């Protein structure tokens, strides 16, 4: 995220859907101040504890919704969001809000799951059963189109393919073994182009498959 966001020492940065503040705290040494915003009070409380433990003095935490940010227009020099947009029910409102709170000429960095089109249907079936809060993952091309529609100028839009440990992924959400087995079977049953993209395989009895993140930097016109 840091390479993508290109933070500057004078920046007032906003990290949206910050969770426990991992991205915001990674930005903190490189910016003047960072604000983390999240819908979940308990997550923000944990972020505050970590901030105090590390002696970080330039990070603040605000309760708020990515689609209705509690900030004025043109308030921030940098906007970041990681691993959250696939949960948003109103994707266009999220992008409009991102554009609104950015100062003219300043950039936003987006990282999220972004499977290619052929694999997406299979992965969507898996994602929504693993985590019911999942709404939809966009492809990189869809991200680019939606950002341009919202008024952004897209500077970087690329996909990073990862070698994904299915068992660990299920464990992160404490998925019950019977359901995990069903979801593994969905991936292993993929055919055609979806299978070629997912390339599932067993290694020492464990399922591995491809997973994708988009890495996007877009700028508000000056």
Residue locations for each model-derived region?
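A short SAM/SAH-binding and catalytic strip from SAM-dependent methyltransferases
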Residues: 77-90
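Short alpha-helix
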Residues: 136-150
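Conserved alpha-helix/loop element of class I SAM-dependent methyltransferases that forms part
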Residues: 1-11, 26
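Conserved Class I S-adenosyl-L-methionine
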Residues: 20, 150, 155-222
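Conserved class I S-adenosyl-L-methionine
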Residues: 107-134
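A short glycine-rich, Lys/Arg-flanked "PGG" loop and its adjoining helix->strand segment in the class I
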Residues: 92-107
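A short acidic, Gly/Pro-enriched loop at the edge of an enzyme's catalytic core
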Residues: 67-78
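Class I SAM-dependent methyltransferase SAM/SAH-binding core
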Residues: 12-68
């Amino acid at each position: 995220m840091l390479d993508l966001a290109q933070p500057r020492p004078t920046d007032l940065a906003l990290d949206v859907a910050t969770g426990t503040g991992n991205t915001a705290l990674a930005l903190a040494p490189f910016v003047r101040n960072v604000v983390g915003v999240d819908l979940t009070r308990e997550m923000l409380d944990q972020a505050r504890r970590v901030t105090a433990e590390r002696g970080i003095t330039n990070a603040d935490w605000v309760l708020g919704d990515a689609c209705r940010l509690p900030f004025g227009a043109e308030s921030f020099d940098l906007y970041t969001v990681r691993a959250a947009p696939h949960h948003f029910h109103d994707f266009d409102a999220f992008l409009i809000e991102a554009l609104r709170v950015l100062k003219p000429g300043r950039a936003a960095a987006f990282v999220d799951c972004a499977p290619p089109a052929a694999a997406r249907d299979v992965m969507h079936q898996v994602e929504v059963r693993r985590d019911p809060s999942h709404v939809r993952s966009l492809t990189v091309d869809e991200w680019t189109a939606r950002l341009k529609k919202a008024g952004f100028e897209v500077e970087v839009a690329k996909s990073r393919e990862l070698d994904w440990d299915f068992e660990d992924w299920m464990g992160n959400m404490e998925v019950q073994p019977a359901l995990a087995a069903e979801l593994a079977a969905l991936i292993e049953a993929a055919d055609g182009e979806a299978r070629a993209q997912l390339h599932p395989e067993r290694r020492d009895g464990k399922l591995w498959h491809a997973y994708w993140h988009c890495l996007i930097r877009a700028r508000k016109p000056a």
